[in-house]
Curated annotation (Swiss-Prot):
UniProt-recorded name of the protein: Imidazole glycerol phosphate synthase subunit HisH
Coiled coil: none
Assembly and interaction partners: Heterodimer of HisH and HisF.
Catalytic activities: 5-[(5-phospho-1-deoxy-D-ribulos-1-ylimino)methylamino]-1-(5-phospho-beta-D-ribosyl)imidazole-4-carboxamide + L-glutamine = D-erythro-1-(imidazol-4-yl)glycerol 3-phosphate + 5-amino-1-(5-phospho-beta-D-ribosyl)imidazole-4-carboxamide + L-glutamate + H(+); L-glutamine + H2O = L-glutamate + NH4(+)
InterPro entries per record: Class_I_gatase-like, GATASE, Imidazole-glycPsynth_HisH
Organism of origin: Methanosarcina acetivorans (strain ATCC 35395 / DSM 2834 / JCM 12185 / C2A)
Enzyme Commission number, as recorded: 4.3.2.10, 3.5.1.2
Length: 202
């Protein structure tokens, strides 16, 4: 069985992601150990909370995560985990991210729409990629976020509309570093299928 490690860096919904992966037949480990991360077949970077707090907690693992990404093995960031994959965020003050995917994290502008963007919304699939194998365009998934990713079309796997069009799922140029702004572990059968697809990529 493939070894999937959920990175424990002090922030994130580790147990719900673990349960989602177990539901699709994986046996994930939760670890912040660099050796366990580097020897994994795939890693997941979950996250809830503030971007700047996440980056402070990730300082000891920044090089390890970059090395894993360079190896070509699959990596998935979820929610805040997607945001920290990017170059920078304007949350709090301008804060540098892991810079594994070019792009910025911006706050939703003031409008009649409530922020955070919370609840079910549909996504538009923009690229043919194994992460979205068998997922229908227009599928509904579950979001909870006040900031969104702004990146290129080349780095966008799926988009979502909430006052503006934003990247609901991102990918690097090699195709192995991916992110979802939505929570696949809370997105019913669609989300579980996405997690299953990730496991199959590992």
């Amino acid at each position: 069985m493939k070894r999937i490690v959920i990175i424990d860096y002090g922030l994130g919904n580790l147990r719900s992601v673990q349960k989602g992966l177990e539901h699709v037949g994986a046996n994930p480990a939760i670890s912040g150990n660099p050796e366990e991360i580097l020897t994994a077949d795939g890693i997941i970077l979950p996250g809830v909370g503030a971007f700047i707090d996440a980056m402070k907690c990730l300082i000891p693992l920044k090089g390890v995560i970059a090395e894993f990404a360079e190896s070509g093995k699959p990596m998935l960031g979820i929610c805040l985990g997607q945001q920290v994959l990017m170059s920078s965020s304007e949350e709090g003050r301008l804060t540098g991210g892991l810079d594994l995917i070019q792009g910025r994290v911006l706050r939703f502008p003031k409008s009649e729409l409530k922020v955070p963007h919370m609840g079910w919304n549909n996504i538009r699939i923009k690229q043919d990629h194994p992460l979205f194998k068998g997922i229908s365009d227009g599928s509904f998934v579950y979001f909870v976020h006040s900031y969104y990713v702004d990146t290129t079309a080349e780095n966008t796997l799926a988009s979502c509309e909430y006052g503006l069009d934003f990247s609901a799922s991102v990918v690097n140029s090699k195709g192995n570093v991916m992110g979802t702004q939505f929570h696949p572990e809370k997105s019913g059968t669609t989300g579980l299928k996405i997690l299953k697809n990730f496991v199959e990529m590992c």
